[in-house]
Swiss-Prot record:
One of its GO terms (molecular function) is kinase activity. Keywords: Cytoplasm, Kinase, Phosphoprotein, Phosphotransferase system, Sugar transport, Transferase, Transport. InterPro entries: PTS_EIIB-like_sf, PTS_EIIB_2/3, PTS_EIIB_3, PTS_sugar-specific_EIIB. PANTHER family: PTS SYSTEM N,N'-DIACETYLCHITOBIOSE-SPECIFIC EIIB COMPONENT (PTHR34581:SF2). Residues 1-100 form the PTS EIIB type-3 domain. The keyword Ion transport does not apply. It comes from Geobacillus stearothermophilus (Bacillus stearothermophilus). This is PTS system cellobiose-specific EIIB component. Its EC number is 2.7.1.205. One of its GO terms (biological process) is phosphoenolpyruvate-dependent sugar phosphotransferase system. It is an enzyme of class 2 (transferase).
Length: 100
């Protein structure tokens, strides 16, 4: 599974990406997880199975949902509590539920 995280600059999600990769490994899930800035995101959408947006750019959800729907890719906002706590396992579970 390919999980794309989008945030304002692509840096604030880097620790979350690390925690999500650790959680995937512990659960035996093969996942490619990466983060990019909102400006770079469009060029990465075709590689993703799920797109998660950082809460700080939730105002861009409608635009990214439209792009995702055109490609058959679910798009949603990361829960602010999970994002703030860097809950990699929780965000990974959310991504898996979106893909089902």
């Amino acid at each position: 599974m390919n999980i794309l995280l989008i945030c304002a600059a692509g840096m604030s999600t880097s620790l979350l990406v690390t925690k999500m990769k650790e959680a995937a490994k512990q659960k035996g899930i093969e996942a490619n997880i990466w983060a990019v800035s909102a400006d770079e995101a469009k060029s990465h959408l075709d590689q993703a199975d799920v797109v998660l947006i950082g809460p700080q750019i939730r105002y861009k959800l409608a635009a990214f949902k439209k792009e995702g729907e055109a490609r058959g890719i679910p798009v949603d906002v990361i829960n602010p509590a999970d994002y703030g706590r860097v809950n990699g396992a929780g965000v990974l579970d959310f991504a898996l539920r979106l893909k089902k």
